[in-house]
A protein has these predicted regions:
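Short, glycine-biased loop/turn motifs at secondary-structure junctions and
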Residues: 1-61
């Protein structure tokens, strides 16, 4: 059970079952936080080793 914190203009992360992902999306043009996503990898809704964005959608790199 680990955790990952990613901050940037288009943050993405992946993890293993039980991991917690904290994604912080910055506004374009500055570093103010626009959106925050907190996701727990459960192996079902959020599968292991799949890239996930701040909204919780699975994404391809």
């Amino acid at each position: 059970n680990g955790f990952c914190i990613v901050r940037g203009k288009d943050p993405k992360a992946k993890g293993q079952k039980g991991d917690l992902l904290l994604l912080l999306k910055e506004q374009p043009g500055n570093s103010q936080i626009l959106e925050i996503g907190v996701i727990c990898i459960d192996g079902q809704k959020y599968p292991e080793k799949a890239w996930i964005d701040v909204t919780g959608k699975l994404v391809e790199l």
